[in-house]
Swiss-Prot record:
CDD domains the UniProt entry points to: AAA, Bac_DnaA_C
Organism whose genome encodes this protein: Bradyrhizobium diazoefficiens (strain JCM 10833 / BCRC 13528 / IAM 13628 / NBRC 14792 / USDA 110)
Chain's gene name: dnaA
One of the record's GO cellular component terms: plasma membrane
Protein name per Swiss-Prot or TrEMBL: Chromosomal replication initiator protein DnaA
Protein family: Belongs to the DnaA family.
Upper lineage: Bacteria, Pseudomonadati, Pseudomonadota, Alphaproteobacteria, Hyphomicrobiales
Region feature Disordered, mapped onto this chain: 89-122
Region span, Domain II: 73-126
Pfam assignment, any one: Bac_DnaA
Cell location: Cytoplasm
Sequence segments annotated as region (Domain IV, binds dsDNA): 350-470
SUPFAM superfamilies: P-loop containing nucleoside triphosphate hydrolases (SSF52540), TrpR-like (SSF48295)
Length: 470
C-alpha cells in the first residue's frame, strides 16, 4: 500500500468513526484493514467470518458511502477474511468411540498449535497461539492487577475456593486481553487435573446455534457445564437473545457450582448495552479489572521481548537501543503495532541483508506513528474522580439522596459526563441511578449557569477536567 492510499484509508476510517460513533467503530471496524484499491472497487479484510457477515449485513452501505466521499468512482466494496497462517501440530489419535443414547454435542475442537493436555484435547475450543503464555507476557503498571488475577486463576486446583468469579478483564484493542486469557488456558491445561476451555464469543454463538439446528442443545449445555474453568474472549460480540440467555444460564450454573469463569471484552460490563441486564449484573458482581494503555516503559519492554523472540529463530537479528527507544516513544497505540514494527524491521534486515538503523526504522514504521489520540473518558472515571474530590462515595452519586453535599457533586458529575463523553442524556441518566434525561439536562444547565459566575466552582470543574484528561 503506497502513502497516498494509506492517507486515504486513514481519512475513510475517520469518516466511518464519526458516522457510527466510537463504541461501534471499536467493536466492529478497529480490526478492518485495507488490502487493495482498484478503479471502481476496494478490497478490505477482517480477521473473522463473523465480523465479515455482520459488517456486510449492517454496515455495507455506510462503508461504501465513506469511501465514495473520498473516491466517487468507487462502486463496490469487497470484504474478505484474513487468513492466520500458523503451523498446526499433528492431530492425536482419537479415542475409541463410546456408545451413548444421546446425540453428541457439536464439536468444539481446538486447533492448538502446540501439545496440550488430554483434557484440553477432549474438550476442544477456539485455536490457541503457543506464543501467548505467561512467560511471554510483559508486566507493567497498567496490567499488573490483571496479570496477578489471571495467575491466581491459572494456579488454582480443582476444589479450591474460587476467589474472583467471574474474573472480567476489559481493555482496548491490542493491550493484552487475549494474551492473558490464552495464558490462563495454556497454564490450566498443563496438567491433567482441571478442564479448561477457551472460546471466543463468536465460537460460543456458532456452537449454540449449531446445537439448536441439530437438536443437540442439551448435550451442548451439559458439555459446557462440565468445565472447571470457562474462558470467554471478546464478549462484546455476543449477539442474539437466545444465545445471550444460554450464556447467562451457563454463567450462573458454573458460578453457582464453584467453577471459575474468566471473560474479556473491550469495555466494562456496564457498557455492554446489547447484553441483558441480568448478564451485566452478574459480570459486575465479580472482579472487574481494566488494562490501561501501554506506558512508554512497558512499550519498551514489549519491544525487547519481541526482539528476543525473533532472535530465537534469527540469531543475528539485532535492534539497537536507540531504535527501541524511538519505537517505544512514537508507536503508542497498542501492542500489535509494536509487534508489527519489529516484524517489519526483521523482514527488511533479512531480505536486504542490512543492519537495523534508526534511519531504517523511521522509514519502515512511519505509518504506525499516529497522532496522539485524546484520552477516552468514561462515566465511571468521572464518578470516581468527582466522588474523591468532594469526599462522597460513588454510591452516593447514584443514590436518591438529596442533601446538599451530594446534590452538587452529582450535578457536576452529570455536567462532566455530558461535556466530556459522547453519551446521550438518557444514557447518562441511566448511569446515575436510573434518572430521567430531564434530570440530567437540569443538572447540566445548572452547572453551566453557575460556572459562569462562580469562580471557585469554575476552578473546581477545570481541575476535575485536567485530572480526567491526564
Amino acid at each position: 500500500m503506497n502513502t497516498s492510499e494509506q492517507d486515504r484509508w486513514s481519512r475513510v476510517k475517520g469518516r466511518l468513526r464519526s458516522s457510527v460513533g466510537e463504541d461501534i467503530y471499536t467493536s466492529w471496524f478497529a480490526r478492518m484493514d485495507l488490502e487493495d484499491v482498484q478503479d471502481e472497487s476496494v478490497r478490505l479484510s477482517v480477521p473473522t467470518r463473523f465480523l465479515k457477515s455482520w459488517i456486510q449485513a449492517h454496515y455495507a452501505e455506510r462503508v461504501l458511502s465513506c469511501w465514495q466521499a473520498e473516491m466517487p468512482e468507487v462502486h463496490r466494496i469487497d470484504l474478505t477474511v484474513r487468513s492466520a497462517v500458523r503451523p498446526v501440530a499433528p492431530p492425536k489419535e482419537a479415542p475409541a468411540p463410546v456408545e451413548t443414547r444421546r446425540a453428541p454435542a457439536p464439536e468444539l475442537r481446538s486447533t492448538a498449535t502446540a501439545p496440550v493436555s488430554a483434557n484440553h484435547d477432549a474438550l476442544g475450543g477456539s485455536p490457541l497461539d503457543p506464543r501467548l503464555t505467561f512467560a511471554s507476557f510483559v508486566i507493567g503498571r497498567s496490567n499488573t492487577l490483571a496479570h496477578a488475577a489471571a495467575r491466581q486463576v491459572a494456579e488454582g486446583r480443582r476444589g479450591d475456593p474460587v476467589m474472583f468469579n467471574p474474573l472480567y478483564i476489559h481493555a482496548g484493542v491490542g493491550l493484552g486481553k487475549t494474551h492473558l486469557l490464552q495464558a490462563v488456558t495454556w497454564a490450566g491445561n498443563s496438567g491433567n487435573e482441571r478442564k479448561v476451555l477457551y472460546l471466543t464469543a463468536e465460537k460460543f454463538m456458532y456452537g449454540f446455534v449449531a446445537a439448536l439446528k441439530t437438536q443437540t442443545a442439551l448435550a451442548f449445555k451439559e458439555a459446557l457445564r462440565g468445565i472447571d474453568v470457562l474462558v470467554i474472549d471478546d464478549l462484546q460480540f455476543l449477539q442474539g437473545k437466545s444465545t445471550q440467555a444460554e450464556f447467562c444460564h451457563t454463567l450462573n450454573a458454573l458460578i453457582d457450582a464453584g467453577r471459575q469463569v474468566v471473560i474479556a471484552a473491550d469495555r466494562p460490563p456496564s457498557d455492554l448495552e446489547s447484553l441483558d441486564d441480568r448478564v451485566r449484573s452478574r459480570l459486575a458482581g465479580g472482579l472487574v479489572v481494566e488494562m490501561g494503555s501501554l506506558g512508554e516503559e512497558l512499550r519498551h519492554g514489549i519491544l525487547k521481548s519481541r526482539v528476543a523472540a525473533a532472535r530465537a529463530h534469527h540469531a543475528t537479528f539485532d535492534v539497537p537501543e536507540e531504535v527501541l527507544h524511538y519505537l517505544a516513544r512514537t508507536i503508542t497505540h497498542n501492542g500489535r503495532d509494536l509487534e508489527g514494527a519489529i516484524n517489519r524491521l526483521l523482514a527488511h534486515s533479512k531480505l536486504n541483508n542490512q543492519p537495523v538503523t534508526l534511519e531504517m526504522a523511521e522509514r519502515e514504521v512511519r505509518d504506525l506513528v499516529r497522532p496522539q489520540e485524546p484520552k477516552r473518558i468514561k462515566i465511571e472515571d468521572i464518578q470516581r474522580v468527582v466522588a474523591r474530590q468532594y469526599n462522597v462515595s460513588r454510591s452516593d452519586l447514584l443514590s436518591s439522596r438529596r442533601t446538599a453535599n451530594v446534590v452538587r457533586p452529582r450535578q457536576v458529575a452529570m455536567y462532566l459526563a455530558k461535556t466530556l463523553t459522547l453519551r446521550s442524556l438518557p444514557e447518562i441518566g441511566r448511569r446515575f441511578g436510573g434518572r430521567d434525561h430531564t434530570t440530567v439536562l437540569h443538572a447540566v444547565r445548572k452547572i453551566e449557569a453557575l460556572v459562569s459566575k462562580d469562580t471557585a466552582l469554575s476552578e473546581e470543574v477545570e481541575s476535575l477536567k485536567r485530572q480526567l484528561q491526564e
